């Protein structure tokens, strides 16, 4: 088994490679990492190919002799690059894989942006049968296009693939920084822009916890997944017979309720909180299908996600750095 990993230097790619190479189920597996802006050090069972996924020659070289692809390469809100990576790059991957005699399975890690994330109201849990609904911008559109391209290869060529649709992927101290009123905030929303500079400075100083409210004034429920839980699902899907041509929501059992986060942090750390009005809506991704067909179970709930993030201490050689906008 030889697995090509695109986006190998990201949080999911590095975690996947680390766990695969130490997994007793995959002692015979080797990894080829396709790297572009950043790279990895080669080691036993890990080789590196450099180049852009938008270049068919690079993709052909990367796919040669591989049995599986774990496709993680993506773009955020970068219109100048997103179609080269999402459409052209994935198209070249799919074309090379379908024409390879030894190829077995293509794993795509998609995103809940394809379902509108928390932008649109979802009156019932979001399952894998719900229609796509991208919100404004190129990133959400790219998530829809990825899923549709893979689905159509099933129809056109009886292609063996699987899509694992993930919400916001957390590791280390990500969640803590997603709650920051400062310029160091991770992702969105940017709380400082919602409350104003003066209040934001005060909240940042006091480590105040934002409670995101929907238009009706209720705390928003938002979906997350820890990188370790997502990687566990990838490791299952690579060989699982019931994963062929299937789409799975890979997320926590329940979305994170911002009101409950505030209560938890008040109880465990004595942190104050403040309500923040937004236009965002609660969404509940349903992960029942992955549990039923793959036997997958998430190990992170709200308390563990929050506690590990707030407890996390970075070493000097692991500075916090954001590699993409959004």
Segments from the language model and where they lie:
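N-terminal Rossmann NAD(P)H-binding glycine-rich loop of SDR-like oxidoreductase domains
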Residues: 3-26
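NAD(P)H-binding glycine-rich loop region in Rossmannoid oxidoreductase-like domains
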Residues: 40-42, 50-88
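Conserved Rossmann-fold NAD(P)-dependent oxidoreductase catalytic core, especially the SDR/UDP-sugar
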Residues: 92-137
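Catalytic helix-loop patch of NAD(P)-dependent Rossmann-fold dehydrogenases
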Residues: 121-161
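Glycine/proline-rich active-site loop of Rossmann-fold NAD(P)-dependent oxidoreductases
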Residues: 156-159, 171-195, 236-248, 271
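Mid/C-terminal beta-alpha module of Rossmann-like enzyme folds, strongest
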Residues: 221, 229-281, 287
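Conserved C-terminal active-site "lid" loop/helix of NAD(P)H-dependent oxidoreductases
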Residues: 227, 277-297, 318-320
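Amphipathic terminal alpha-helices
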Residues: 302-326
């Amino acid at each position: 088994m030889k697995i090509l990993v695109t986006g190998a230097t990201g949080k999911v790619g590095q975690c996947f490679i680390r766990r695969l190479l130490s997994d007793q189920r995959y002692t015979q597996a080797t990894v080829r990492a396709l790297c572009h802006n950043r790279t990895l050090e080669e080691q036993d069972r890990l080789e590196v190919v450099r180049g852009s996924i938008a270049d068919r020659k690079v993709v052909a070289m990367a796919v040669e002799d591989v049995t599986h692809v774990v496709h993680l390469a993506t773009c955020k809100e970068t219109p100048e690059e997103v179609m080269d990576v999402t459409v052209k790059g994935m198209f070249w991957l799919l074309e090379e894989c379908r024409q390879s005699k030894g190829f077995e399975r293509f794993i795509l890690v998609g995103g809940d942006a394809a379902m509108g994330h928390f932008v649109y109201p979802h009156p019932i849990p979001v399952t894998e049968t719900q229609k796509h609904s991208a919100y404004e911008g190129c990133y959400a559109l790219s998530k829809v296009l990825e899923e549709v391209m893979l689905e159509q290869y099933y129809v056109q060529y009886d292609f063996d693939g699987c899509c694992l649709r993930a919400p916001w992927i957390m590791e280390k101290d990500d969640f803590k920084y997603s709650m920051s009123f400062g310029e160091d905030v991770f992702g969105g929303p940017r709380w400082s822009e919602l409350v104003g500079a003066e209040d934001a400075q005060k909240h940042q100083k006091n480590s105040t916890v934002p409670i995101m409210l929907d238009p009706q004034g209720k705390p928003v429920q938002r979906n997350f997944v820890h990188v370790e839980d997502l990687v566990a699902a990838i490791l299952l899907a690579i060989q699982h017979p019931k994963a062929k041509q299937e789409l799975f929501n890979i997320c926590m059992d329940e979305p994170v309720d911002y009101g409950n986060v505030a209560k938890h942090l008040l109880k465990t750390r004595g942190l104050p909180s403040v309500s923040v009005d937004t236009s965002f809506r609660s969404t509940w991704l349903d992960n029942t299908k992955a549990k039923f067909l793959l036997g997958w179970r998430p190990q992170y709930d709200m308390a563990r996600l929050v506690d590990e993030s707030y407890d996390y201490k970075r070493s000097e050689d692991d500075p916090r750095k954001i590699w993409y906008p959004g």
